[in-house]
Amino acid sequence: MSYQPTPEDRFTFGLWTVGWQGRDPFGDATRRALDPVETVQRLAELGAHGVTFHDDDLIPFGSSDTERESHIKRFRQALDATGMTVPMATTNLFTHPVFKDGAFTANDRDVRRYALRKTIRNIDLAAELGAKTYVAWGGREGAESGAAKDVRSALDRMKEAFDLLGEYVTSQGYDLRFAIEPKPNEPRGDILLPTVGHALAFIERLERPELYGVNPEVGHEQMAGLNFPHGIAQALWAGKLFHIDLNGQSGIKYDQDLRFGAGDLRSAFWLVDLLESAGYEGPRHFDFKPPRTEDLDGVWASAAGCMRNYLILKERAAAFRADPEVQAALRASRLDQLAQPTAADGLEDLLADRAAFEDFDVEAAAARGMAFERLDQLAMDHLLGARG
């Protein structure tokens, strides 16, 4: 298998990823700003499928209408020249100080109304550029102290906002769905809808739940100490994995945004195995930050590394699934039984079946080994390249 990516691999990057200048709370930028046109061209050369953007990534905040149209025109020309696509777009509702207390859940009503109009304006552009997914990350929706935010009222306002956006998209006839991106904390002390589970539960309360799914990010779920592949599996099970953000994270700490494959490599292996075996057809979107130690050559090396690592893990996961010893080990661990309904014969037959309870030998069942260690070591052998 070649580790050289092609557009058919559906790898995408946000303008804000490779465009991150290295500025953090403790230090200034270490790299110059990148022109979005340059970003499109370089990512196309690396084999990417598309780019994504916040409104302010493409059009500097406060631009006049004339300036806005000029930025969009140049961007379109770059897309046309390279064949790159825009599968997803989103709104920056976190950088400007006006959003210091949030956007859709800000205590100030006028800020909430402004946030909705800002979002709607970029939804129009997203649809114009062919995006099929609109991501919503509520990075400022939260609080640092208990009395500062009435969470129930805030969730009412969050629901109101998404219902209005769904109404707008429907009224305009846009072929666009929303993907809510959870995160437990940072920049706020506590963020609303902190995990995939919270977001999935929230979506079921919306007026048009079919329009909404999730955009889980590797590092965000791991910041909460959760198993990312398990969260993705539940999103797939619910039919709600509308988009995914791939990066790397090393445990429960600040949001590291490492290149994909860095950090928890075992989790990355199981994630790729899941996405590929489940037939996920959406973009493989990298939301990472090249370390501020890197110059621009390092930025592009980091982006290339994201794609290369995914392709290597894809190859290793496929070899794992095709290995006859692995298939035997899966049967020994009774994974085939887990795929069978527990009571396909119905409740009446279950209650009448003495072997299910009265005659069930609990001691014999308790003594059965599960053979998980053998299965896991086979996975490790494939991950580490010890098996072909």
Curated annotation (Swiss-Prot):
<dbReference type="GO" id="GO:0005737">
    <property type="term" value="C:cytoplasm"/>
</dbReference>
<dbReference type="InterPro" id="IPR013453">
    <property type="entry name" value="XylA_actinobac"/>
</dbReference>
<comment type="similarity">
    <text>Belongs to the xylose isomerase family.</text>
</comment>
<keyword id="KW-0859">Xylose metabolism</keyword>
<feature type="binding site">
    <location>
        <position position="245"/>
    </location>
    <ligand>
        <name>Mg(2+) 1</name>
    </ligand>
</feature>
<dbReference type="GO" id="GO:0042732">
    <property type="term" value="P:D-xylose metabolic process"/>
</dbReference>
<keyword id="KW-0119">Carbohydrate metabolism</keyword>
<keyword id="KW-0479">Metal-binding</keyword>
<feature type="binding site">
    <location>
        <position position="217"/>
    </location>
    <ligand>
        <name>Mg(2+) 1</name>
    </ligand>
</feature>
<feature type="binding site">
    <location>
        <position position="257"/>
    </location>
    <ligand>
        <name>Mg(2+) 2</name>
    </ligand>
</feature>
<dbReference type="GO" id="GO:0009045">
    <property type="term" value="F:xylose isomerase activity"/>
</dbReference>
<dbReference type="InterPro" id="IPR001998">
    <property type="entry name" value="Xylose_isomerase"/>
</dbReference>
<dbReference type="InterPro" id="IPR013022">
    <property type="entry name" value="Xyl_isomerase-like_TIM-brl"/>
</dbReference>
<dbReference type="GO" id="GO:0000287">
    <property type="term" value="F:magnesium ion binding"/>
</dbReference>
<protein>
    <recommendedName>
        <fullName>Xylose isomerase</fullName>
        <ecNumber>5.3.1.5</ecNumber>
    </recommendedName>
</protein>
<feature type="binding site">
    <location>
        <position position="287"/>
    </location>
    <ligand>
        <name>Mg(2+) 1</name>
    </ligand>
</feature>
<feature type="active site">
    <location>
        <position position="54"/>
    </location>
</feature>
<feature type="binding site">
    <location>
        <position position="220"/>
    </location>
    <ligand>
        <name>Mg(2+) 2</name>
    </ligand>
</feature>
<keyword id="KW-0460">Magnesium</keyword>
<keyword id="KW-0963">Cytoplasm</keyword>
<feature type="binding site">
    <location>
        <position position="255"/>
    </location>
    <ligand>
        <name>Mg(2+) 2</name>
    </ligand>
</feature>
<dbReference type="InterPro" id="IPR036237">
    <property type="entry name" value="Xyl_isomerase-like_sf"/>
</dbReference>
<comment type="subunit">
    <text>Homotetramer.</text>
</comment>
<feature type="active site">
    <location>
        <position position="57"/>
    </location>
</feature>
<feature type="binding site">
    <location>
        <position position="181"/>
    </location>
    <ligand>
        <name>Mg(2+) 1</name>
    </ligand>
</feature>
<feature type="binding site">
    <location>
        <position position="217"/>
    </location>
    <ligand>
        <name>Mg(2+) 2</name>
    </ligand>
</feature>
<keyword id="KW-0413">Isomerase</keyword>
<dbReference type="Pfam" id="PF01261">
    <property type="entry name" value="AP_endonuc_2"/>
</dbReference>
